[in-house]
C-alpha cells in the first residue's frame, strides 16, 4: 500500500487544492486567499515523494508482478468480505455501495491478472498502464474504507453518538460509490486493452 500513500494520496491532494482555487473563482488564482499556494504545495508532493510514475512502477513491479499478484489478491479478498457485509445490510445505501465495490474489485483483479501475466514476458504492456493502475487501486481501496465507515455509521452505538454526522457518512459513502468507484471498470479497460496504443508511435514521429 506504500505506493498508494505516496502516489494516490498526493495526486488526490492536487485535485482537492485545484477545486479550492476553482470555487474562489478569479480570487482563487491570486495570492490573497492563499489557495494558489496550497495548489503549488500539493503539486510538489507528487515529486518529493518519488514521482507518481515511479510509485506506479513500484506498484506494478515489486508489489504486483513479483509475487504473481498474490498480495494484491489478498487485499481483494478482504474487500470481498466488506462487500458481503454491505450486501447483507438492510440499508439501501449499503447495498448500492456493495454493488459498486464488487464491480470495482472484479475490475482490479482483472488488472492484477493482466500484470502478473505480462510483467516478465511483455513488460511494456504491464507498465504502460502503471499510473492508471495506481489510481484504480487507490480508488478501490478508498472505496473499501468508505464501505467500512458506512457499516460503522449504521450501528446503534454510532447513531446514538451523533445521528446527523453518521447520516452524512452514509451519504458520502454512497456518493463515492456512485461517482468514483463507478469509474474503475473503465480504468480497467484502458489498462488491459490500451497498452498497444501507448507504444504505437514510432520514434521518428517525435
Language-model region placement:
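Alpha-helix capping/hinge segments and adjacent helical runs
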Residues: 1-74, 174-201
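C-terminal amphipathic alpha-helical interaction region
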Residues: 66, 81-206
